[in-house]
Amino acid sequence: LLTSEKRIEVSQLAEYLGVSQVTIRKDLDALEAKGIIKREHGHAVLCSTDDINGRIAYHYEEKKKIALKATELVNEGDTIMIESGSCCALLADTLTQLHKDLTIITNSAFIAEYIRGKSNFQIILLGGIYQQDSQVMVGPMVQECVSNFFVDYFFIGTDGYDSRIGFSNRDQMRAQAV
């Protein structure tokens, strides 16, 4: 609802979902703690679409389905590289729920922090120029670091797809990192 409305009142959510406002407030508190929304007096606002926390909420169900499908490829003991992005963050989170022994290499400080404490995975964070909103490392140092690893799978995110031109990314520095 928030992805289409951008701002919604607690009372509207409670009525629409058929639950109490207390339940809605608890759920909104949990979403705010994850950085997905901001609570303001009597309503909730989705975080900026440039912010990774806010992007997770956009098309959440579709991204979660993609993450579950991608998880089916991964086996215990695999070394995988996960590029930054909201779908990739959900993939990393899903992996923590379904696997116990993985090595995850990422250029995303957000992903490293997002799964920290949820697993005993070895997490390798690649270095580079830090982009604060997306919490990702970019630039030639990332490319240099990547060349030092062999992985079983490499998962990347994309901002769009067109059948004529293929995949696209609105951030050239992020696109060049992978």
What name fits each language-model region?
Residues 89-91, 113-114:
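Phosphate- and divalent-cation-binding pockets in alpha/beta enzyme and binding domains
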